[in-house]
Swiss-Prot record:
The gene is hopAB1. The keyword Transcription does not apply. Belongs to the HopAB family. Residues 181-194 have a biased composition (Low complexity). Its main location: secreted. InterPro entries: E3_ubiquit_lig_AvrPtoB, HopAB_BAK-bd, HopAB_BAK-bd_sf, HopAB_E3_ubiquit_lig_sf, HopAB_PID. Residues 1-94, 165-223, 299-320 are annotated as: Disordered. Effector protein that plays different roles depending on the species and plant cultivars that interact with the pathogen. Acts as a virulence determinant by enhancing the development of disease symptoms and bacterial growth. Acts as an avirulence factor by eliciting hypersensitive response (HR) and plant resistance. It is found in: Secreted. This is Effector protein hopAB1. It comes from the Bacteria. The lineage of its organism: Bacteria, Pseudomonadati, Pseudomonadota, Gammaproteobacteria, Pseudomonadales.
Length: 523
């Protein structure tokens, strides 16, 4: 019975047969010629022209000029016809030049490859400024119309990027790299992806674990760009703590930036304006905010001296001297002590003494009203939202909007326990690229809204937010859900409370449908 047809190195077709099957004479002759042509002991026969030249060179004595001409002829013929590997299409040559430009610019080639695929699939993208500028030179309509999946140049570029990334991984497979990959793994311009190795011995919990995409908000090239911007702002005397607070409020609540900070950002090439047609994840401010948070978190305080109490005002000093003076009437002493207590108490506290909570720490500088109210409610179980808001907002007209935002955020928070899960091992795969801050303190994954993420942080609910929704029983799939962006669900809830819009695609996102987009990361 005939077996499987195939072709040998010399393009002779051969056929597998069973032992009891007869072989015709014609097939015997063809198989003999095929085996002789494929035999490793005998090289393939030379062309007739080459054989003729060899016979002529071995013939009777030739003149020196004739012999030199014959010996040089094969070299001229070979040089005139380049091998197949050297004959590249114009698009392939241009793709090679693009890769070289990206390498010289310090771009993350793996991120460019992933983002190029996203552009061609009409998905969310996150290019660094260097990557974007280089690609716009060759794809000038990329920002307006994207890149067609039928583009010959784009497909050649994807293939060349894939080959280069594979070569880089092979070259970087040093013991130090292997040690780093075994401990966990390695998420991205000022827009925040990186390459890493899958931990040996880890098993995937689903068939989709091998085809996932993530956004890395601080690759090496982008970190250098962000650090340069931060250095210039520091030299200009910008208050970085104030800048972080203002950026956080702008990202979370769209509160306008102070004019001086807006001008400072524009002077270093960052346009803080957020147009309506640009999703949050695509805005350059996000990656800059992540870099700013990392810089400030890395600063360590060097002073251990206790803070000196503030100097008392002249009026307060006078009252204290009066209390130490010769005996006063009891009514006078009580009036002075009450007056001193009122002076020491902040005005907002005096106005809200009737609704003051049992536990009420001061509001942090970088904490908006919604976040502060949620923290107070957690510290005062059973306290009504309206009472919590009234405890620190003195203007009754401004309270209702904050109350509405808090209730919207509180509706989203309980959904965390109902989300579908992705294991930490799968999240740390090459395609997703999650890096826990506890395992990678110098290269941790940053939340979409700034701070670094860790499953061991009790104040965070780490999730991956997908671009496309799927019903709850289905596991994560890169083909269906597309890109996955890591963030703290508590921060996302605060953002959605003010603006119920998906930060990746601007679709509506609220407590009713968040379970279709979000995946909980579990140890």
């Amino acid at each position: 019975m005939p077996g499987i047809n195939g072709a040998g190195p010399s393009n002779f077709f051969w056929q597998w047969r069973t032992d009891g099957e007869p072989v015709t004479e014609r097939e015997h002759d063809s198989s003999r010629s095929a085996s002789s042509a494929n035999s490793p002991e005998f090289p393939p026969p030379a062309s007739p022209a080459e054989s003729g030249r060899q016979r002529l060179l071995r013939s009777s004595a030739l003149s020196r000029q004739t012999r030199e001409w014959l010996e040089a002829t094969p070299a001229r013929v070979q040089g005139a016809t380049p091998p197949a590997e050297a004959r590249q299409s114009p698009e392939a040559q241009q793709a090679e030049r693009i890769v070289q430009e990206l390498v010289r610019g310090g771009a993350d080639l793996n991120n460019v490859r992933t983002m190029l695929r996203n552009v061609m699939d009409n998905n969310a993208v996150a290019f660094s400024r260097v990557e974007r500028d280089i690609l716009l030179q060759h794809f000038p309509n990329m920002l307006m119309t994207g890149i067609s999946s039928d583009s010959v140049l784009a497909n050649e570029l994807r293939q060349r990027l894939r080959q280069t990334v594979r070569q880089q991984r092979i070259q970087s497979s040093t013991p130090a790299r292997l040690a780093d990959s075994s401990s966990g793994s390695s998420q991205r311009s000022l827009i925040g992806r990186s390459t890493m190795l899958m931990t040996p011995g880890r098993s995937s919990s689903s068939s989709a674990a091998a085809s996932r995409t993530s956004v890395d908000r601080h690759p090496q090239g982008l970190d250098l760009e962000s650090n340069e911007v931060l250095r210039r702002l520091t030299q200009e005397g910008v208050d970085m703590e104030r800048l972080r607070t203002s950026l956080g409020r702008y990202i979370m609540s769209l509160e306008p930036l102070p004019p001086d900070l807006r001008r400072a950002l524009e002077s270093v090439g960052i346009n803080p304006f957020m147009p309506e047609d640009l999703s949050l994840v695509d805005h350059p401010v996000l990656n800059f905010s992540a870099a700013l948070n990392r810089m400030l978190a890395s600063r360590q305080t060097t002073t251990n001296s206790p803070e000196l109490p503030p100097l008392a005002s002249s009026a307060e000093s006078g009252r204290r001297r009066l209390l130490r003076s010769p005996p006063l009437l009891s009514g006078q002493r009580e009036w002075i002590e009450q007056n001193m207590r009122q002076e020491a108490e902040p005005q907002s506290s005096r106005l809200n003494r009737a609704v003051r909570l049992a536990v009420m720490p001061p509001q942090n500088e970088n904490e908006d009203n919604v976040a502060y109210a949620i923290r107070l409610r957690r510290l005062n179980p059973g306290a009504d939202v309206s009472r919590v808001v009234a405890s620190f907002i003195t203007d009754p007209a401004a309270r209702q909007q904050v109350v509405n935002d808090i209730r919207a955020a509180l509706d989203i928070a309980p959904q965390f326990s109902q989300l579908r899960t992705i294991s930490k091992a799968d999240a740390e795969s090459e395609e997703l690229g999650f890096r826990d801050a506890a395992d990678h303190p110098d290269n941790a994954t940053s939340c979409l809204f700034g701070e670094e993420l860790s499953l061991s942080n009790p104040d965070q609910q780490v999730i991956g937010l997908a671009v496309n929704p799927t019903d709850k029983p289905q596991p994560y799939s890169q083909e269906v859900n597309k890109a996955l962006t890591f963030m703290d669900m508590k921060k996302l809830a605060q953002y959605l409370a003010d603006k119920p819009e998906h930060p990746l695609n601007r679709q509506r996102l609220d407590a009713k449908n968040i379970a279709k987009y979000a995946f909980k990361i579990v140890p």
